[in-house]
Amino acid sequence: MILIIYAHPYPHHSHANKQMLEQAGTLENVEIRSLYHLYPDFNIDVAAEQEALSRASLIVWQHPMQWYSVPPLLKLWMDKALTHGWAYGHGGTALHGKYLLWAVTTGGGENHFTIGSHPGFDVLSQPLQATALYCGLKWLPPFSMHCTFICDDDTLQAQARQYKQRLLAWQEVNHG
């Protein structure tokens, strides 16, 4: 099962993420957990989140890039759901062998996220990749959609279909 942990503080403003979720939602064995819908008060139900994580073979962290990082509720979700003794540390093997995909949207162009005058995705992904590895997750190459503020609808739809194809390809290879 694919579990998409979706974290967008203003989901009604994001055509890109909406289209990504619509495409992913057409696949079988996909569960989408919209954190800002589930937890508007930031009071995370750790047991429910860990139960959802337990059912998944592929975990996707889908969100917009905010100040070169994740939205605040996703960071809090990581702090609360990925607990010592469950996700890491002594006895913390619940996520071992599962896969993690970082699916991120940006308002800036792809060149804005290359090494040079701005940090590249390899640099920006390091905290997330380190978290994944620390929890025994297998890190997959990220999926990114750039220029989402200025893309026309056809471009966004094409990129959302690429996202769906990426998830479908993972399902076909991993039977999940």
UniProtKB/Swiss-Prot annotation:
Pfam families tied to this protein: Flavodoxin_2 (PF02525)
Signal peptide coordinates: none
Domain of life: Bacteria
Catalytically driven reaction(s): a quinone + NADH + H(+) = a quinol + NAD(+); a quinone + NADPH + H(+) = a quinol + NADP(+)
Residues bound to FMN: H8, S14, H15, A16, N17, M65, Q66, W67, Y68, T105, T106, G107, G108
Keywords tagged on the record: Cell inner membrane, Cell membrane, Flavoprotein, FMN, Membrane, NAD, Oxidoreductase
GO cellular component: plasma membrane
Primary location group: membrane
Stored InterPro entries: Flavodoxin_fold, Flavoprotein-like_sf, K_H_efflux_KefF, KefG/KefF
Record localization: Cell inner membrane
Gene3D superfamilies for the chain: 3.40.50.360
Molecular functions per Gene Ontology: electron transfer activity; FMN binding; NADH:ubiquinone reductase (non-electrogenic) activity; NADPH dehydrogenase (quinone) activity
Cofactor(s) of this protein: FMN
Record-listed E.C. numbers: 1.6.5.2
Keyword field contains Cell inner membrane: yes
Membrane topology according to the record: Peripheral membrane protein
Statement: the UniProt record of this protein carries the keyword Membrane: yes
BP-aspect Gene Ontology terms: positive regulation of potassium ion transmembrane transport; potassium ion transport
Function summary: Regulatory subunit of a potassium efflux system that confers protection against electrophiles. Required for full activity of KefC. Shows redox enzymatic activity, but this enzymatic activity is not required for activation of KefC.
Family: Belongs to the NAD(P)H dehydrogenase (quinone) family. KefF subfamily.
Assembly: Homodimer. Interacts with KefC.
The protein, known as: Glutathione-regulated potassium-efflux system ancillary protein KefF
Species per Swiss-Prot/TrEMBL record: Salmonella gallinarum (strain 287/91 / NCTC 13346)
High-level lineage: Bacteria, Pseudomonadati, Pseudomonadota, Gammaproteobacteria, Enterobacterales
